[in-house]
Each structure stands twice: as structure tokens, then as C-alpha cells.
Amino acid sequence: MSKYLFLSATDLEHNELEMFGSKIHIIGVGKINAAMNTTRLIEKYDPDCVINFGSCGNLKDYKIGEVLTVGEVFNNIDVRPFAEYGHTPFHGLGSFKLQGKADIKCFSTDQFYHKHRKDYAEK
């Protein structure tokens, strides 16, 4: 049976205390809180899957309640002259795997986009 770890930045982003018998953990707002508390909970519970509930901005006309998955995102990155804008020097090296864990996709940001800033988001 798979073990799920359900996360939310605040209790305002969901209306349940549990999901499929698993507690929804509040991890706090921002990427530092997300990284620190998600890591702590993964170490404690050793889940098979981590699911984060919450709000996200977008530049398209998605509706509230639609489920979005992240494929590949470049954000908050400007390490020129070491790499192209939106990339790190590690871009293109392939996937990184945590020891003993399956392929992992992870994304976090603390920037707020709206349609008036679309030019910035598309750099």
C-alpha cells in the first residue's frame, strides 16, 4: 500500500484535515519553509508520494480547482555569466536522484505573476 504525504502552506488552502486517512501537514509559506518542512516530513514518514495542495499563479486561464502538474520550470534563476538566464550550471546534466528514492520532480517559488508581468515570466 502506498504511503502519501499531503502538504499545504496554510490551512486556508484546503478544507480537510485528512485525505485518504492521512493528515494534511501545514508546512508554511515560501520556499524556505517548504524545503525545510517537506524534508523533515519526508525523513519522518518516508512516503511513496508527496502531494502539495495550494494556490498557484498562472498566465493562462485555468479555473480554480483544476489540477496542474509540473513538468519543467525555470524560475528565480539568474546566475549569468555562469549559465544562460533561467538555468543553472547543472542544467542538462540529467536527473538527480536522492539515495534510495525514485525519480523526483520538485518546484517552488515565491514570485507572484500576473498577466501584466507576462514579459518577465517569459524571459
Name each model feature, range by range.
Residues 4, 8, 12-123:
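Glycine-rich phosphate- or other oxyanion-binding loops that anchor nucleotides, phosphorylated ligands
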